[in-house]
Amino acid sequence: MPGPEEFHRDIRAAKRFGLAQGLLLLPSLFSLMLAIAFAVGGDWREAAVTAGICAVFTGVLVCLERRQKRQRQEATRYYTFPLPRAYDYETVCAAIETAPGVQWTYLCDETARICRIEDVFSWRVALLYQPEFSASACKAQRDRANRAANRAHPSKQEGLQWEVASRARINLVVCDAVNDALSRYIGAHAQRLLSRNECIINMAVVGDRLLLPPVRGADVDFPSLNRCSRSAGLIWSLLCQNPNEPRIDL
């Protein structure tokens, strides 16, 4: 299974794709406008040459986007981050809830709680326990916990663009073992949830492993990729650290 190195490699590759996308899109649009201007002025030769340049840039961009989409469709293996010891639900909760920057924790029941962490970003972490994972049961459990936490700690859903871009949600599920349902849940590509204004990252802890969904081939903006990378680093560092030592950002 791919691990932390592959995760960060795929994040970097997605950022490079975004940069290449922007660099190709700008000259393509500029060439198109020039071609239109030449055509309007009656200079058909220059218009044809400029249109050809535009077609080249557009063709390269389309090829890159198709390659990115193919990688996204082929990325079905989740990332496995090693942990120093096996974790159960209570020890996971203790590691997260004692982190620097925790603003509040709401205990919904013995298997679900929500906590808010303010640091580089504003994280809302749902801590859920599913001995045997079920996607429908997990969704119902998460929705119930979020509704209860929203009543106890109301927060505005909208805001300035920079405020929204600084928020992220982490759904951290603790399971006793990996079953087919959990493999499908964590194996689902992160693209759709990362594309939301307040991006969502699904994670799971099973024994001495932290599992994260694939991001290979992602086509999302830089802030969303940064939130994904920072969220993974936050949870992994909290679970790897000695509770008596300060957290070290990865």
Positions of predicted regions on the chain:
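N-terminal topogenic membrane-targeting module
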Residues: 2-4, 60-125
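Juxtamembrane interface helix immediately N-terminal to a transmembrane segment
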Residues: 3-27
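N-terminal signal sequences
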Residues: 25-38
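Core hydrophobic alpha-helical transmembrane segments of single-pass membrane proteins
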Residues: 30-31, 52-56
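Hydrophobic alpha-helical transmembrane segments
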Residues: 39-54
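Short, flexible beta-strand-to-coil junctions
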Residues: 118-123, 128-134, 174-178, 207-208
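Catalytic cores of nucleic-acid endonucleases
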Residues: 131-191
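Charged, structured surface patches that assemble and position nucleic-acid processing machinery
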Residues: 188-250
